[in-house]
């Protein structure tokens, strides 16, 4: 199952995913709504560590962990377990939104410092 075809997240994903994003880049392995493994193709520690950090700041997330199966393998596995009032897919989308907001803040702060 890909991120865009996941039943619980289809509507919210389509409003978040930019048109240029390859939805086949993320595969979801899940048997419960509150627990899932997301396999990202062509991603590494940069996204994995950032997502793990912001997910663990979310009080609705019980567990987050990522791994790179092998250095020559171009995949990153992210495991998320949430409390029952939010799905793992919703917490992933919130985490990606948080990273985007943090990046925007850093960019604006840096540019403002350059302008001074």
From Swiss-Prot:
A GO CC annotation given for this chain: RNA polymerase III complex
A Pfam family it matches: RNA_pol_L_2
Key words, A-Z: DNA-directed RNA polymerase, Nucleus, Transcription
Coiled-coil segments on the chain, per record: none
Domain of life of the organism encoding this protein: Eukaryota
Family: Belongs to the archaeal Rpo11/eukaryotic RPB11/RPC19 RNA polymerase subunit family.
Role noted for this protein: DNA-dependent RNA polymerase catalyzes the transcription of DNA into RNA using the four ribonucleoside triphosphates as substrates. Common core component of RNA polymerases I and III which synthesize ribosomal RNA precursors and small RNAs, such as 5S rRNA and tRNAs, respectively.
Name of the protein this chain belongs to: DNA-directed RNA polymerases I and III subunit rpc19
């Amino acid at each position: 199952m890909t991120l865009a075809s996941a039943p619980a997240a289809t509507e919210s994903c389509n409003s978040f995913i930019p048109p240029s994003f390859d939805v086949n880049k993320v595969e979801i392995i899940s048997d419960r709504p509150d627990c899932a493994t997301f396999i990202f193709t062509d991603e590494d520690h940069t996204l994995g560590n950032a997502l793990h950090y912001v997910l663990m700041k979310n009080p609705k997330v019980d567990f987050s962990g990522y791994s790179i199966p092998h250095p020559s393998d171009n995949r990153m596995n992210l495991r998320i377990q949430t409390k029952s009032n939010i799905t793992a897919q919703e917490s992933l989308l919130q985490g990606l939104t948080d990273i985007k907001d943090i990046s925007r803040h850093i960019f604006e702060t840096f540019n403002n410092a350059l302008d001074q």
